[in-house]
Amino acid sequence: MRKATIFLLLSLLTFAGCSINPVTGQREFVIMSTAQEIEMGKQNYAPMQQSQGGVYDVDPALTIYVQGVGQRVASQSGVSLPYEFVVLNNSVPNAWALPGGKIAINRGLLTEIESEAELAAVLGHEAVHAAARHSAKQQSRAMLMQVGVMGTAIAARDSDYGGLIVGGANVLAQAGLARYGRGAELESDYYGMQYMSKAGYDPQGAVALQETFVRLSEGRRTDWLSGLFASHPPSRERVNANVATASALPAGGLRGEREFQAAMRKTIEIKPAYEAYDEGRKALAEKNIEKALAQANQALTLFPDEAHFHALRGDIRLVEDKFDWAVTNYSRAIDRRDNFFYYHLQRGLAKKELGQADAAVVDLERSNELLPTAPAHYALGDIAKARGNLPDAIQHYKVVAKAGGEYGQAATTELVRLELPSNPGAYVNRACSADGNGNLVVSVRNESTVQVTGIQVAIQYNDASGRQQQKRFSVRGQLPPGQVASVNTGIGPYTAGSSCPAHVIAAQIAE
């Protein structure tokens, strides 16, 4: 019966989710509709750009050029999507596509390719990911796995492992869907070459591009390993497949070396400034402040109009606890580019350290408007707590707590600190059982992430004459996270499994 239930759930989803791949014409399992994909891409395009360095706006003509090449190639897909193309201010060589045709290419990848045909190959490849609904298929696979997990959890809920299966399967699902699979990459290569050929480009550009990627992957450059190769792993198989595809397509077509180099002229000229900036970021991460500042100053000397460079110097001053200098540098960054979350976030944090709470809130809220982050919400929680606005503080800390990581742990601790005195039962669970004599035993479990002390439980019960009584019992010592302590109340008789008359009425953090 349990297996039948799971099979029915999976069968219903599979039947409902079958659709025709608009690129290959094959029937595939996709639950998400095209309209949902478009909306997902629309909602996430701007936040993704923010999280990847923001728009590369120092050379608007380059963006216009890239958009033109992208639209020229995507128009050959035969799939009606609201395609958009953007260049991101990020030195990591990478490109990506969101559902619904929202595509981005990093400055760092543009500086590595050599022709318009190679650019067309990159953008055509990403256009296929969108047109062939590869992200939607991944989402559908995840949903199908979740149904299988749900069915297994239903089937195993009476076992000792019921609570473990869901979490473990979720981890496996996330790990399995971390990047496009081999089939999706080969499919995007093949149809991307069809698109670029129809658009008038030489398909040999795609062959040259993959040859370059394989060579760079063999050199194991860390920026490539963390960028394009993490999500689009190159291989000799892909090179050979591209050679075979190119041989079946019309020979010739536009290579566009001259056009590409003309469009890239300014970006190539200022590339040394970004290289100095990247070295400065690396030095700062390694806590080499002197080198970081020297590299930031070199970058600013070469190209003083880039806001990222001013923000780097602000970060250095922030690490040095020179908060007023940091504010000055972040303000210079904002003067040059006021629509990037990071500058507002960092200036808000610096102003908070200077005790300028009102000004800090303005910056932090502006940062969250552009891209909600854990540091911004955590700082806003701190400010609200200092002002005695506990509801707002709790709201911000709860947002951060869900994010996990270092900030999430700190926010969870703050939540316990704020809520434990007034709502101890939210963090300390109680359970009732009977000892061998039928007397009530109350067990308490610390569900928080911090050590707790001063736990008190109240027992409401009727005595032999039927009068309602209340007694309080204290749990001795400190209770670490996840640990259980028990108190034998001596009150009885208590029937195991009946309503638990105990309530946790007090607890505090063990400082």
Predicted regions and their residues:
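Canonical tetratricopeptide repeat
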Residues: L312, Q346, A379, T413-E414
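Peri-catalytic and regulatory segments of divalent metal-dependent proteins
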Residues: S19-D160, L177, Q194-L228, A248, ...
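Terminal connector regions
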Residues: E419-L420, P424, C432-N437, Q468-R472, ...
